[in-house]
């Protein structure tokens, strides 16, 4: 296309967009009162005010405009919630109206948004998938039955760290935790390990997961201006189509191999989640197809690996910076489980300080700082303002966790604040909702609760930790790397010392 023609088309589009933006803003102002917020620039709105770390930028803006704030991101109205009280209004009192999702263009790869528990609108299919996940994956009885597999993975983690300790080898703590999380899930689902410690395959899988999660949070012109979706201007949909294909190829190979085994004379039978889901699919193919199974597996691997490992890395970084708290939880572990190397999941309830450390880590470092965006299905009045239909709702749990009106010394890592508190992470106490709340709460919370506590306990109870090159604990870089998940910008490399 001739450059002059292309330039004219671009100018014409943005001229039209500017007129549309201004007139729509004025017309809406006549019929509804939006929550306060920074005045938007023509066309682009407040996009550039998000910065490199939107959770931090939005928290600063909320100090000026309040806990219920509106912005214009391109052509989309976005409402940001930054306090526990307003979060309760949205996710509890008005849960039904706000239970839908804003679909990022990145999630449309392989039509994932049409089959995903994460992105589906509340519907019969969504309810069926939630029911399957609850009954076949995360029910207490099924998790109890598969604890032996997780115990094996904890022992493998322990043995790997012993080898590193013997050779005085530093480990990338987040990468090590990721490998354990990945094998937790793959062994529970497929009876196989996807990775070995220190292997390239583990890093490759982690890179794929991170790139997909990053695509969901990368500012995307196609999301800000949906009329441009057909162009995929940043190539995000194309990249995700490739990444999803790699994940689906892995799942296809495993599923096909299992189906061949089931159809052969092989009498050996796996007692894992895949077997249960294949049985359910065979008996209810109209309700749960193999295609839906693959999309469900994609959600589970994305949601259950990076989130767990990143939370553990934040927890260990905070404990190394606060050695007196590390010693306190180690003493608790020694008192409760004694000389055992591996903690049992039934021990967690007897370890209140360990639980407090996990809660405090989530308070300061929520793994999904803005949760997954919600969508308003109708105009709703909250705190005297109108949240308009089809607007995007962001719940800034990072801001809620650092709210001085809710927490004493909010910037200080202090697990003690939870020792005599009824606050839990199950979506009932809006001061701490790292897994969300309401009907959209993360279905994997029961498994995450078990794995986080047992993995952290294994690392603390059996090992001391020292930093490389004489680095002091106070020198650990706690800067954030923003994505759909919130990571340490500089990976934590530490040397285990066997106790």
UniProtKB/Swiss-Prot annotation:
| Residues the entry annotates as binding heme | 442
Gene Ontology CC annotations of this record: membrane
Keyword annotations for this protein, in alphabetical order, are:
Glycoprotein, Heme, Iron, Membrane, Metal-binding, Monooxygenase, Oxidoreductase, Transmembrane, Transmembrane helix
Q: Which residues are glycosylated?
A: 55, 76, 279, 284
* Membrane-related topology note: Single-pass membrane protein
The entry's localization annotation reads: Membrane
Q: What sections of the protein cross the membrane? A: 3-23
Enumerate the Pfam families for this protein: p450
Q: One GO MF term, please?
A: monooxygenase activity
Give the enzyme's main class according to its UniProt record, as a single word: oxidoreductase
What coarse category fits the chief subcellular location reported for this protein?
A: membrane
This enzyme's EC code(s): 1.14.-.-
To which protein family does this belong? Belongs to the cytochrome P450 family.
The name under which this protein is listed is: Cytochrome P450 76T24
From what organism does this protein derive? Answer: Catharanthus roseus
The coding gene here is CYP76T24
């Amino acid at each position: 296309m001739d450059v002059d023609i292309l330039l004219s088309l671009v100018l014409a589009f943005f001229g039209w967009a500017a007129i549309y933006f201004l007139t729509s803003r004025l017309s809406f102002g006549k019929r509804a009162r939006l929550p306060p917020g920074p005045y938007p620039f023509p066309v682009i709105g407040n996009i550039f005010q998000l910065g490199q770390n939107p959770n931090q930028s939005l928290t600063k803006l909320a100090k000026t405009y309040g806990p219920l704030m509106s912005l214009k991101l391109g052509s989309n109205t976005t409402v940001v919630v930054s306090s526990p009280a307003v979060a309760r209004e949205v996710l509890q009192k008005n849960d039904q109206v706000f239970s839908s999702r804003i679909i990022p263009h990145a999630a449309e790869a392989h039509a994932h948004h049409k089959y995903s528990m994460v992105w589906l609108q509340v519907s019969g299919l969504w309810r069926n998938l939630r029911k399957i996940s609850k009954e076949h994956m995360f029910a207490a009885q099924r998790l109890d039955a598969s604890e032996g597999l997780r115990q094996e993975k904890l022992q493998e983690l322990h043995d790997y760290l012993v080898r590193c300790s013997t050779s005085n080898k530093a480990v990338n703590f987040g990468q090590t935790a990721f490998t354990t999380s990945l094998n937790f899930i793959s062994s529970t689902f497929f009876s196989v390990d996807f990775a070995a410690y220190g292997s390239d395959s583990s890093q490759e899988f982690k890179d794929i997961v991170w790139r997909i999660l990053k695509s969901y949070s990368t500012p995307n012109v196609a999301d800000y201006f949906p009329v441009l979706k057909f162009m995929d201007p940043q190539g995000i949909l194309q990249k995700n189509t490739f990444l999803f294909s790699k994940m689906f190829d892995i799942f296809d190979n495993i599923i096909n191999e299992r189906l061949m085994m089931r159809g052969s004379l092989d009498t050996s039978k796996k007692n894992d989640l895949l077997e249960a889901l294949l049985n359910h699919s065979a008996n209810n193919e109209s309700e749960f197809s193999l295609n839906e199974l693959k999309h469900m597996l994609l959600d589970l691997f994305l949601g259950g690996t990076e989130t767990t490992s990143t939370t553990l890395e934040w927890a260990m970084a905070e404990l190394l910076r606060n050695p007196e708290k590390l010693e306190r939880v180690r003493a608790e572990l020694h008192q409760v489980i004694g000389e055992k190397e591996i903690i049992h999941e039934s021990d967690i309830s007897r370890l209140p300080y360990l639980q407090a450390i996990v809660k405090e880590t989530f308070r300061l470092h929520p793994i999904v700082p803005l949760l997954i965006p919600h969508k308003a299905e109708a105009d709703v009045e909250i705190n005297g303002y109108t949240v308009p239909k089809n607007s995007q709702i962001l719940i800034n749990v990072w801001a809620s966790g650092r709210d001085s009106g809710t927490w004493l010394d909010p910037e200080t890592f202090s697990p003690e604040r939870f020792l005599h508190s009824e606050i839990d992470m199950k979506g009932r106490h809006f001061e701490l909702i790292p897994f969300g709340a309401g009907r959209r709460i993360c279905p994997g919370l029961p498994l995450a609760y078990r794995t986080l506590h047992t993995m952290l306990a294994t690392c603390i109870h059996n090992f001391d930790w020292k930093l490389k090159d004489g680095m002091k604990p106070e020198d650990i870089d706690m800067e954030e790397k923003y994505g759909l998940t919130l990571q340490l910008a500089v990976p934590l490399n530490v040397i285990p010392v066997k106790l």
